Amino acid sequence: MSTVTFFNPYLCGPRKPRAPSAGEGGAEGAAAARARAASAPFLQIVPRGCLYDGERGLLKHNCALAPRMFFRDRPYVLSKDLVWPTLPPPAVPASTTERAPRAPAPSADLLFHMYDQAETVVSADSKELIHPGYRHRITPCGVVLRLFGRTADGASLCVNVFGQDAYFYCRYGDAQSLHDRLYRLSDTLELAPVFHVRVRRVQRCSIYGYGTRPFADLYLVACGNWHVLKKMGQCLLDEGVEVFEVGVSPLTRFLLDKKIPSFGWCRLRRWHARPAHGRLSTAELEVDCEVADVRGVDDVAWPLYRCLSFDIECLSGGGAFPVAENLDDVVIQISCVCYPVGGTEEQRAAFPVAERHLFTLGPCAPIPGVLVYEFPSEFELLCGFFTFFGRYAPEFVTGYNINNFDWRYLLTRAERVYRWPVAEYTRLRFGGRFCAYVPGGGGRQPGFRTAQTKVLITGTVVLDLYPVCMAKVSAPDYKLNTVCELYLGRQKEDLSYKELPRAFLSGDAGRARVGRYCVQDAVLVKELFEKLNYHYEAAAVARLARISLRKVIFEGQQIRIYTCLLEEAAARQMVVPTFRSGAQRGAAPGAGGGGGEETTYQGATVFEPTVGYHHAPVAVFDFASLYPSIIMAHNLCYSTWLRDDPGTPARPPETPARPPETPAAGPSGAAHAGGVPGATFRTPFRTPAGVPAAAAGGAGAGPPGGGAVSSASVGGRAAVSPSETPAEREPEPAPEDVFVVHVGQGVSYRFVRENVRASILSELLRRWLAQRRAVREAMRECEDETRRLLLDKEQLALKVTCNAFYGFTGFSQGMLPCLPVAASITTIGRDMLSRTSAYIEAHFAEPAFLARFFEPGDLPRADEPPPTVRVIYGDTDSVFVRFGGVRAGAIVARGEDLAAAVTEALFTEPVKLEFEKLFVALMMICKKRYIGRVFGSDALVMKGVDLVRKTACRFVKTVVRDVVELVFRDAAVAEAATRMSELTLEEMRRVGVPAGFHVLLQRLARARDDLFSGRVETAALVLSSVLSQDVSRYKQLNLPHLAVIRRLAARSEELPSVGDRVSYVLTAGPPDGRANAPNYELAEDPDYVAAHRVPIHAAKYFEQVVKAVTNTLYPVFPRGVVRRDRFLADLVPKRVYLGDEFKRHARPVEEEVCESERGGSGLLSSLDSSR
């Protein structure tokens, strides 16, 4: 079309733009607009379809006029001083050049809620307007902490805290020598010349090991330049100097030393308000204070915060999936949904900002309920979005996969394409950070991060729901549509990225359609945000661990435990050592710090299960918080571990990767009765009458106080500091005050008991568990729905953190690994499980014991077989107990009493065995794989079967579920399954397949018919695999999901990111292809298969059905069958399927009748081939 449909004052030269009037663009007038018109020129990129409907291509033009937007046919010049037309006017001027009324002098404490923090190093020559009373804190330089939050009356606030130093500890000969060495290091490392180091002697002992008194040569090294100090500490560590707590940031020091909640209410005793012209932040109120003036307040309530959910749409110039670095791949629309978080219901109802906003290139038809802002070019669109972001100033930003795509795309376009810095749109006018980056060069480090890309915006917390949903829900894929269906019960109106360009370029109505789609995504994310309430959960963890909210979001659980240990160690006048990275990776701590053989230790016990279909009550007992209770019961900790040499090691003893679970001989075998061989220990457990001494755990386990193994026994002897003398060591505790754990192979670890030194880990766990009980009690009494939600997230944070302690000590790449603690925990856990199993089998079937818990009517009559009790399975912290002849309802009623009897007989507090559930029928397949029906419920509990695996397609899951339902619901099928499991193959050849089993075979035949007849929709046949790393890093390239990615790339379609599940369908392949072609040759993208009607490979899918059913019904098949999948396939009635070219010559026939249904045994004629 030749008609211009959108007035672009830059691309349409003959037409003169109307200058904004005094009332347009907020406070700006014509003179201001003319002044900005002389701003630096910028590149305009706009799709031709925005000016000429339906046309493709881009228009590019260098423009010297000021960027602007159009809202309701009125132009607005985009500048730092713009008052956004649809937002409430700010309480303070947007520019520092305009003065605001002075804040009143502080006459009382200032109460505020803090949600985010930033740490900066400020030097004495800084241009920042700092009150003279705080100047000495930054001379020559010093750390300034910026605390962002809101006051009690809802005003945004920035608190500048002065006087917080960064520091670490180290052992050295004398202070002057250490001082001189640090300054020499600064010359070597070419560090910043402006800094001052302070060294003073302190009295502390190490948390790592029991046996030393406070060091006589320990010094605290403090510095106002945090970056310099961190490098100095690392250099000392690399040179072999014993250092402690290197890398702990000044913000962490502030939160721990002052007991400040990282997300919560605080109070300022003294403060000084900055005038408007001297403010560094864009907050309504900015104050300065000393570090000693900040106090924490115990209150979990939230003020009203602003949240923004957004989504972007892009247009590729070449028709492929958009790439931000390509000049022609432009951003065409951005949707924003503004809504409140926290506060009271009345405050949320009075939220003054409109909810839905759309930023679009070109003219757009009106969209009901959406404020539409139109822009002449991409640069102005980005400028408008970031200006809106700065004016709205949200405390929280959310979206779906915004870290890996949206933010990275926007920042790349702004900074690389247009060379336009966006840091000025943070909460700080200068010195803020607005960036997206991948730590460690893009590789994933398990246990440290929950998201690959980190997005840092000073004063704004970014909460991407994509990694949150991946961690919280099991789904075949994690597309927004799938997640919304799971959580919200509805799907979005989808618009493919191939259809999107045509709609956008078609005209105003098409852009409105794309806009509705774009806004819809942001709205769905907002609803997911409010449904998941992950922000409340993350805030509770941040308060508990005293770490920033962004660390909870982007870091793993290691940092949470580490900061808690730092706080508790400081309260006990202890320091936490810093180890070399080689030791953390599992390198043997040899004298040279070189690599050594990696050590392993025995993991949790998994009993060999009694495989089969158990049509009798099976009770499940498990230990409540097994590993935390072991730590508390036995006083295990870094600080209670008795080493051969109490001197602090230069690196930790060898800590391996997380151990595999250890198989045991079985519930009834010798290893089960006597515990794990070579893994006994001296224990305070009581040995009940009737239980063998070996099963009771460690009689004669070693000489008192003996058997300890130094770090030399696990890869290298720890070095003893030359400055430590025997006189500085604690005296050796008495033998009765030492708890010895023999972990096998001649290795033992010793720990002092609680009366000698209380375990730090135990103290933390006891405190948190008591706090969790108090919170749950408060929940029961709480009637306010919002407060109840906050309390629930708090108790969940306490639970998750408590359960993370074992992983913290046992993770070889962690921040403070410790083999003695981790190995001792698993050793004690294995013994507890073995002792529990032995006690149950020795006592539960005794008549006297049963009479204590059950009524005569619950047990068999005198003329019936006596009751039987047998442990059929055990896994880490739970045992499965099969009761024969006992009424199921009675077991449920007295289950807790049975568990309490075991606890009382075997264990000491806080160890507690609990009754979890009762299966009325259980199919035990193998280790970690079973299916059972729970008493009082129709629901089936499944573990490890294809029904709950993400890799299986929906069609296979449906067939397997139907088969399982038949086995557990249909009495005839259940009886046939039980009968078949009791037969041998030879017996079955003589008597035939049990009659009830044919119902199951008919279901398989129907599934085969559906596949070969093309009656299964493509969506039900989708398989998926995780893209765990970049495609180029795979050694095995012949994988189906990698083949799909290569096909997508060849067609220039959207490619998945690392961590995504890649979906694919197995197609029939070319007609002349191999019959047994590998899956990677047949894998294709599901959307491509559906769009082009590509036939699927029915035989391969039926093969998957048979294998999945075989794996699920593994215990049902006769004994002696080796190829069970082939055996099952031979049982299914045979059928020949005609191709399309033959179907018109065929006539329908009735369903075939299985030969064995007519009484014959011909069905088994081909079973010999399955042997």
Curated annotation (Swiss-Prot):
Residues 663-674, 709-725 have a biased composition (Low complexity). Residues 649-662 have a biased composition (Pro residues). GO terms for biological process: DNA-templated DNA replication; viral DNA genome replication. SMART domains: POLBc. GO terms for molecular function: DNA binding; DNA-directed DNA polymerase activity; nucleotide binding. It catalyses: DNA(n) + a 2'-deoxyribonucleoside 5'-triphosphate = DNA(n+1) + diphosphate. Residues 647-735, 1149-1171 are annotated as: Disordered. Residues 697-708 have a biased composition (Gly residues). Keywords: DNA replication, DNA-binding, DNA-directed DNA polymerase, Host nucleus, Nucleotidyltransferase, Transferase, Viral DNA replication. Its EC number is 2.7.7.7. GO terms for cellular component: host cell nucleus. It holds the Pfam family DNA_pol_B_exo1. Residues 1149-1158 have a biased composition (Basic and acidic residues). It comes from the Viruses. It is found in: Host nucleus. InterPro entries: DNA-dir_DNA_pol_B, DNA-dir_DNA_pol_B_CS, DNA-dir_DNA_pol_B_exonuc, DNA-dir_DNA_pol_B_multi_dom, DNA/RNA_pol_sf, DNA_pol_B_thumb, DNA_pol_palm_dom_sf, DNA_pol_type-B. Belongs to the DNA polymerase type-B family. PANTHER family: DNA POLYMERASE CATALYTIC SUBUNIT, DNA POLYMERASE DELTA CATALYTIC SUBUNIT. This is DNA polymerase catalytic subunit. The lineage of its organism: Viruses, Duplodnaviria, Heunggongvirae, Peploviricota, Herviviricetes.
